């Protein structure tokens, strides 16, 4: 099988390319830029393009499948050549489905918690010796790649993103997987550049539920009123399995589950993670994992990459970084750290980096999301607004949107670093939240200075 990737350098795309290479496929690809870690990983397996850029000469009649990434544009010369030759062109999710259509497909959907729930499921299945393929949105400890596709595994666990499939396929990715078992963790408006209204966004989840295979299962968080409505209003012939936060206690900085199997210590914390864990438990039960085996396996789960990651700690302070960027994720993450360390003050810092978060109309969704922080800081780079072709934001507008008069708004990375290092860190924790990089701020070095 000969497969060509247009935009092979993307996080998801290069992992799929590696998975197909390991499967014995003949893989080629192109991109206009490839960054680390994609660059080294592709080069290691001889898949890094010799030259950067697009070239229609890369497309020939003997290619069995062309996989088109979101980074490419609809007028991409390689895409146009493939269309001219009548080659089969797939979006990333379409090809994932093509590779997994004969397996039991488990799809984890929702506005938040998808990666963590998927990671929890894979961690448990791995420890319990259950053979499963997977596709997940972050690099996980104990797993070499973010995509695994084999002929032998009877089950595949897929993280189901609601963003668009490709430049020429405007369907949300998770509409293409046709799950046998689906999970919805929560619904909170996101991707406003694609779904301009909340109702339009919710509609995508209605359609997702309708696409669950006949006699399939929907596992859903009943604490979320919108999810509950989507699940219970569906006419699809499926079984419903609700979940919510499990009984637990926090003792001396450690969270314990209170279960029929006894008191289970965890390495993760935060109510949102406990809810995620309960959803993962129901998925694993659907795949034949006993409660006893689940609880034994989940005890040493340390969390998904970039989720409440501990960068440094001392007796007086700790520094965490988290991928949180949407309002619901920010609120849950701030509350988790504050509740886990209720004897310490919390300084929470959020970078506005995505199209949605920098959109003034959407910014009001962040109202009181950082209420539990003793000090709240919002950082954004005005150049990012220009790059995304959005109108300028003022500090006053940001403060008003967050409904917090004492909110500190900073627009220069060096100034942010200096501000944080000037604070006293006795009995104080720092939480840095972003899907970006705070414009290159070295958080590991910052953590060392804060906790020394």
Segments from the language model and where they lie:
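ATP-dependent carboxylate-amine ligase
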Residues: 1-36, 42-50, 62-66, 82-87, ...
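Fold-independent oxyanion-binding glycine-rich loops
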Residues: 8, 30-31, 69-71, 92-93, ...
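Phosphate-binding loop of NTP-binding sites
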Residues: 19-23, 57-61, 70, 74-220, ...
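Short, charged/polar "capping" segments at the starts of alpha-helices
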Residues: 34-39, 57-58, 73-76, 142-143, ...
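Beta-strand->loop->alpha-helix junctions that form or flank phosphate-binding loops
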Residues: 51-54, 90-97, 135-138, 234-252, ...
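A generic structural signal for residues located within well-ordered alpha-helices
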Residues: 116, 272-278, 325
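Short polybasic amphipathic segments
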Residues: 254-259
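Short pre-catalytic strand/loop immediately N-terminal to key active-site residues, enriched for Gly-Thr
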Residues: 264-269, 317-321
């Amino acid at each position: 099988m000969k497969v060509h990737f247009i935009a092979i350098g993307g996080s998801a795309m290069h992992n799929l390319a590696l998975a197909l290479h390991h499967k014995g496929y003949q893989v080629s690809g192109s991109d206009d830029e490839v960054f680390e870690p994609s660059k080294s990983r592709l080069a290691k397996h001889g898949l890094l393009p010799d030259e950067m850029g697009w070239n229609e000469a890369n497309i020939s009649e003997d290619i069995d499948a062309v996989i088109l990434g979101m980074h490419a544009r609809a007028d991409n010369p390689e895409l146009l050549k493939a269309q001219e030759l009548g080659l089969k062109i797939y979006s990333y999710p379409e090809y994932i489905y093509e590779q997994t259509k004969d397996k039991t497909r488990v799809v984890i959907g929702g506005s938040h918690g998808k990666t963590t729930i998927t990671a929890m499921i894979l961690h448990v299945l791995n420890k319990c010796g259950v053979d499963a393929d997977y596709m997940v949105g972050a690099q996980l400890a104990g797993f070499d790649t973010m995509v695994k596709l084999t002929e032998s595994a009877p089950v595949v666990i897929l993280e189901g993103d609601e963003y668009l499939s490709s430049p020429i396929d405007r369907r949300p990715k998770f509409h293409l997987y046709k799950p046998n078992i689906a999970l919805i963790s929560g619904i909170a408006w996101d991707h406003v550049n694609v779904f301009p209204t909340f109702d339009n966004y919710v509609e995508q989840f209605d359609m997702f539920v309708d696409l669950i295979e006949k006699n399939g299962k929907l596992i859903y968080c009943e604490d979320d009123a919108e999810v509950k409505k989507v699940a219970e209003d569906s006419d699809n012939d499926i079984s419903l399995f609700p979940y919510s936060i499990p009984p637990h206690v926090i003792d001396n900085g450690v969270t314990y589950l209170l279960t029929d199997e006894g008191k289970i210590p965890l390495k993760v914390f935060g109510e949102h993670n406990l809810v995620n864990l309960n959803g993962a438990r129901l998925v694993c039960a659907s795949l034949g994992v006993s409660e006893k085996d689940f609880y034994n396996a989940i005890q040493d789960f340390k969390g998904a990459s970039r989720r409440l990651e501990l960068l440094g700690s001392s007796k007086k302070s700790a520094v965490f970084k988290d991928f949180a960027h949407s309002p619901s994720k920010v609120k849950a993450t701030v509350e988790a750290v504050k509740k886990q360390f209720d004897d310490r003050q919390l300084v929470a810092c959020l970078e506005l980096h995505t199209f949605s978060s920098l959109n003034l109309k959407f910014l009001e969704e962040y109202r009181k999301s950082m209420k539990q922080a003793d000090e709240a800081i919002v950082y954004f780079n005005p150049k990012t607004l220009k790059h995304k072709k959005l109108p300028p934001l003022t500090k006053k507008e940001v403060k008003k949107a967050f409904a917090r008069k004492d909110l500190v708004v900073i627009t220069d990375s060096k100034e942010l670093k200096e501000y944080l290092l000037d604070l006293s860190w006795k009995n104080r924790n720092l939480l840095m939240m972003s899907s970006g990089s705070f414009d290159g701020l070295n958080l590991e070095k910052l953590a060392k200075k804060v906790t020394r």
